Design a protein with these regions (language model features):
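Juxtamembrane intracellular "pre-TM" segments in multi-pass secondary transporters
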Residues: 1-15, 203-238, 261
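Substrate-agnostic recognition of the 12-TM MFS/MFS-like secondary transporter fold
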Residues: 15-33, 60-98, 113-172, 190, ...
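Transmembrane alpha-helix termini and helix-breaking/packing motifs in multi-pass membrane transporters
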Residues: 34-47, 102-108, 162-186, 260-261
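Helix-to-coil boundary motifs at intracellular loop junctions of multi-pass secondary transporters
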Residues: 38, 42-43, 81, 135-139, ...
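A helix-boundary/kink motif common to multi-pass secondary transporters
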Residues: 44, 53, 83-84, 110, ...
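Loop-to-transmembrane helix entry
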Residues: 46-65, 259-277
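Helix-loop junctions at the membrane-solvent interface of multi-pass transporters
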Residues: 98-109, 173-174, 195-203
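Helix-loop junctions on the cytosolic side of multi-pass membrane transporters
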Residues: 134, 138-139, 143, 178, ...
Length: 289
């Protein structure tokens, strides 16, 4: 019997999980873009050297991505060992604590605190990543997996881009109260994600007796060897990694590029992200066809 992938959005086995991962992606990017907005506000106020703005804008994505390289193999083991809905609740609780630290950084306008919080956000996202994908085969039927994955990618990508828009507009809309608005926004979004995570049904751990290997190097090498042996896995890893690498680098530099090289305003930046969002959403939905 034919079914629509959107039918999954009416089911408790999928909707809370879908909402949580979208909240997480949205908040991460609100936070990152609010940092860029703060940099612009500090330059305008004369409290930061304009040359440092570009440096921090380049540094922020690297700080966020670094934990993926360091801890992905360990995070994957936790996803195998821990009951999945419990692990999601743990990661969303971590997000509340991390965003509380970020709020302090915004209020103090202290980039050191914000970069520490950004690194911690990367750690939290690294821990959430494996369970985000490994939970789907446990809650979806085989014929629902392609459509379900498409919805997740659509939700994630659009949440990322909308988060960038929202975060970028915080200081433009709130003006001199931008730091307070950013602090409140990231904490409230983290709390919302944690509350929704409590509705995710229990999903048993895949390997509850697994012994965690804390050295990430041997585990990472073993994963790479496994991916090398399986062509489909290798190509999937390379494709997804390249998409997020190029997307993160391009969108992270888009605000400065639009202003400095194109002579545009915030409107041009918003328009470019909106076009990209439409393309990502359309592609994700078409993957089931």
């Amino acid at each position: 019997m034919a079914h629509s992938q959107f039918d999954l959005l009416r089911q408790r086995r999928f909707l809370p999980y879908f909402t949580v991962q979208a909240f997480g992606a949205f908040n991460d990017n609100v936070f990152r873009q609010a940092i860029i907005g703060l940099l612009g506000a500090m330059v305008a106020a004369g409290t930061m050297d304009p040359a440092l703005r570009g440096t921090y804008a380049q540094l922020a994505p690297a700080v966020f991505i670094l934990p993926y390289f360091l801890f992905s193999s360990i995070a994957g083991q936790f996803a195998e060992r821990t009951e999945k809905s419990k692990l999601i609740r743990i990661t969303t609780a971590m997000e509340i604590a991390i965003m509380s630290l970020a709020a302090v950084g915004f209020l103090l306008q202290d980039m050191r605190v914000l970069l520490v919080a950004l690194f911690a956000t990367g750690v939290q996202s690294t821990l959430f990543g494996p369970v985000k994908y490994s939970i789907l085969p446990s809650v979806l039927k085989p014929e629902e997996l392609t459509g379900g994955n498409g919805l997740v990618e659509m939700g994630t990508s659009i949440a990322v881009l909308l988060g960038m828009l929202f975060g970028g507009l915080i200081f433009a809309v709130a003006g001199e109260h931008g730091t307070q608005a950013a602090a409140v926004a990231v904490i409230l979004l983290a709390i919302c994600g944690n509350l929704v995570s409590r509705a995710i049904p229990r999903v048993d751990a895949s390997a509850p007796e697994l012994k965690i290997q804390w050295n990430p190097i041997p585990e990472s090498l073993a994963i790479l060897r496994l991916a090398k042996k399986q062509l489909a896995v290798r190509n999937s890893v390379l494709g997804v990694s390249w998409f997020w690498f190029t997307g993160t680098m391009l969108t992270g530099n888009l605000p400065v590029y639009a202003e400095t090289h194109l002579g545009g305003t915030q409107t041009l930046y918003v328009f470019a992200l909106a076009i990209f969002s439409i393309g990502v959403g359309a592609g994700s939905l078409l993957c089931e066809k």
